[in-house]
Amino acid sequence: MTLAPETTDLKVRLRLTDDWFTACDLGALLPGRGVAALLPDGGQVALFRDRSGELYAIGNRDPFTGAAVLSRGLTGTHQGRPFVASPLLKQRFDLATGVCLDDETVRVETYEVKAA
């Protein structure tokens, strides 16, 4: 079954230092699928929405390979915590904390995110 994008005027906004940045329309985020967005500094963020509607934003760069691919990873849960698995080497990153579930010494940046 394919989900149709929802129609809404809400935007996904990220907290960058002391300001909010509009990353995309909320309707662009399908539950369980990631979207990459370009940040003002040239970096990338991976945006996710889970099936309950919770939003997550992490750095898109896989720290193990250096490739900007986390937005294309597979999502799931581990012990009730949402994660994305890198599509390259399959390391899993907690979407709320950015910590790698397979090597806790490694993490990706996380961002405060909201729909407004």
Task: Name the predicted role of every residue range.
Residues 92-102:
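Short metal-binding segments enriched for Cys and/or His
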